Amino acid sequence: TGFLIGFSLAQLLWGPISDRIGRKIPLSIGIILFIIGSIGCATSTSMTMVVFWRVFQALGACVGPMLSRAMIRDSYEVTEAARTLSTLAMIMAVAPIAGPLLGGALLTIGTWKLIFWVMAGVGVIFFGTIFFLPETLPSASRTHQLLWETFANYWTLLKTRTFMRYVLCVTAFYVAAYAFITGSPKVYITYFGVPEQYYGLLFGCNIIGLTLVSALNRRLV
């Protein structure tokens, strides 16, 4: 819960910052925060410390998914951007399903702390790739609004019905996805008696469905 709160609220700050100073600097800072948060979780000795570092981790983790959309918008025309965003949506839809599978595999060879060490390592790799990324928002296209002026635009978005309909659609998907992720182990293993070693296979079937539907959506767009 702490991670999701930090993940959602921090985007409201990183968005205006990236519009003002470009994409690469916020992306670099975000990945550094993610790495520090992951190491903090891996070295925690109490649940309070884990929650704190998970929130800290989320402050950086949100930057990648958010700025990837902005960088696509910067780099492509409307039609191609829509197709590319559809591909990105497929990746982001599969991630919440694939994550528990990978985490479960890591737990078979180590403790829960190994998961966070792996996350820190992946963060280091991603940080290295930033040096090969071009800056997609040139200086001439950057906003000169103050942060508080940008925040005022959020209220305008909340009053826009078309925008809110899309928000509700995405919200409905993630509510259902996380409800399934948290509740399916009990239903499969406890209620239906599915052996634990087969649960991962059943859980992985969702990835196939999400991939096929997202690929279809990309063609329709």
Region roles according to the model:
Residues 4-12, 96-97, 207-211, 215:
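Residue-level signature of mid-helix packing/kink "hotspots" within the transmembrane helices
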Residues 8-48:
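Conserved MFS/SLC helix-loop-helix module at the cytosolic interface between two early adjacent transmembrane helices
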Residues 17-18, 102-110, 188-189, 220-221:
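Interfacial helix-cap and linker-helix signal at transmembrane-aqueous boundaries
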Residues 47, 53-94:
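Cytoplasmic helix-loop-helix junction between adjacent transmembrane helices
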Residues 49, 78, 86-131:
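Helix-loop-helix hairpin linking two adjacent transmembrane segments in secondary transporters
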Residues 136-167:
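Juxtamembrane intracellular "pre-TM" segments in multi-pass secondary transporters
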Residues 199-221:
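Transmembrane alpha-helices of Major Facilitator/SLC transporters
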